[in-house]
Amino acid sequence: MKSISCGKEYTEDVRNINIRPEQLDDFVGQKDLIQNLKVFINAAQTRTEALDHVLLYGPPGLGKTTLAQIVSKELRVSFRATSGPLLSKAGDLAAVLTTLNAKDVLFIDEIHRLNRSIEEVLYTAMEDFCLDILVGEGPSTRTLRIDLPPFTLIGATTRLGLLSAPLRDRFGIPLHLEFYSFEELVNIIKRGARVLSAEIEEDAAREIACRARGTPRIALRLLRRIRDFVEVKDDKKITYEVADSVLLKLGVDKMGLNKLDMNYLRFLFNTSGPVGIDTISIALSEDVGNIEETVEPYLIKISFVKRTPRGRVLTDQAKEYLSL
């Protein structure tokens, strides 16, 4: 099985690859999703067909890219990766699709960022396994049809609502990734420490998990930074005291909140009534998309913020936390 990235600018974060699971049985968390995915893969293999198209959606850092790679390995087929912003014209998409072999997996990250003209080309590729490309200009324009082998498209998005209904409906296997439980994160951190040859105490692993916002990517990033401090100080293991000290230096509090989170909460705290997302974006000098994708999901999960038709509202729980 080959793993190939398409496009000059698509550089998938390879820093976590060595501590990522490589098969579904090793994947921690998302239990129901994994069990269902095993059934779909086994059924496709039994019928010797390409797996139906898969849409992975949910907050950032929950394992969408990892799952896509695992699916290709379980299917024993080649894996090709690109991202929505790189496919700016039909020729870009055609260049990727025409290199696929039967049953290969094509992974499109940030698929919600595809422009509508590319989506329309993708419709026939997904449904009929062919490409209709316009050739020529003006009166001499004609449609060139290119047949494609059956393949599996795996799309990943943090913004499901930005996908057009026609594109969304063409995915036969929509899978929602949820935030991870505390114990699942502890297990992920322990496994990561073993792979990194870093000795870690149970209390330290649990403290990192407490501040990881239910997100494996964050948990592993924090683990790596703590390991840096331990190695520089020539300590033998990651203890609770070391983990707590480093996390505070990194600006991560006991709830896993960082400076941007706190600025967001304080702005709502000091503003009367519901506040619109555009107002928050201007006040914090942050992109609306970044706030909606990386800040709000966790704050909503821990019941610190509510979204209402009139805007964002701080909960009593958040007000109490800010008053501590």
UniProtKB/Swiss-Prot annotation:
Residue positions binding DNA: R307, R312
Q: Molecular function (GO) terms listed? A: ATP binding; ATP hydrolysis activity; four-way junction DNA binding; four-way junction helicase activity
Q: Which SMART domains match?
A: AAA (SM00382)
Positions that bind ATP: I19, R20, G61, K64, T65, T66, E127, D128, F129, R170, Y180, R217
| CDD domains associated with the record | AAA (cd00009)
Q: Which GO terms describe its biological process?
A: DNA recombination; DNA repair
> What Pfam family is a match, any one?
RuvB_N
Keywords of the record, alphabetical order, are:
ATP-binding, Cytoplasm, DNA damage, DNA recombination, DNA repair, DNA-binding, Hydrolase, Nucleotide-binding
UniProt catalytic activity: ATP + H2O = ADP + phosphate + H(+)
InterPro entries in alphabetical order: AAA+_ATPase, AAA_lid_4, DNA_helicase_Holl-junc_RuvB, P-loop_NTPase, RuvB-like_N, RuvB_C, WH-like_DNA-bd_sf, WH_DNA-bd_sf
Q: Name one GO cellular component term.
A: cytoplasm
- Span list, region Head domain (RuvB-H): 254-324
Identify the EC number(s): 3.6.4.-
Q: Which cysteine pairs are joined by S-S bonds?
A: none
Q: Which residues bind Mg(2+)?
A: T65
Enumerate the residue ranges of region (Large ATPase domain (RuvB-L)).
Answer: 1-180
Cell compartments where the protein resides: Cytoplasm
Question: What does the entry note on its domains?
Answer: Has 3 domains, the large (RuvB-L) and small ATPase (RuvB-S) domains and the C-terminal head (RuvB-H) domain. The head domain binds DNA, while the ATPase domains jointly bind ATP, ADP or are empty depending on the state of the subunit in the translocation cycle. During a single DNA translocation step the structure of each domain remains the same, but their relative positions change.
The record's similarity note reads: Belongs to the RuvB family.
- Its job: The RuvA-RuvB-RuvC complex processes Holliday junction (HJ) DNA during genetic recombination and DNA repair, while the RuvA-RuvB complex plays an important role in the rescue of blocked DNA replication forks via replication fork reversal (RFR). RuvA specifically binds to HJ cruciform DNA, conferring on it an open structure. The RuvB hexamer acts as an ATP-dependent pump, pulling dsDNA into and through the RuvAB complex. RuvB forms 2 homohexamers on either side of HJ DNA bound by 1 or 2 RuvA tetramers; 4 subunits per hexamer contact DNA at a time.
How this chain assembles, per its entry, is:
Homohexamer. Forms an RuvA(8)-RuvB(12)-Holliday junction (HJ) complex. HJ DNA is sandwiched between 2 RuvA tetramers; dsDNA enters through RuvA and exits via RuvB. An RuvB hexamer assembles on each DNA strand where it exits the tetramer. Each RuvB hexamer is contacted by two RuvA subunits (via domain III) on 2 adjacent RuvB subunits; this complex drives branch migration. In the full resolvosome a probable DNA-RuvA(4)-RuvB(12)-RuvC(2) complex forms which resolves the HJ.
Name assigned to this protein:
Holliday junction branch migration complex subunit RuvB
Species this protein is from: Wolbachia sp. subsp. Drosophila simulans (strain wRi)
Lineage of source species: Bacteria, Pseudomonadati, Pseudomonadota, Alphaproteobacteria, Rickettsiales
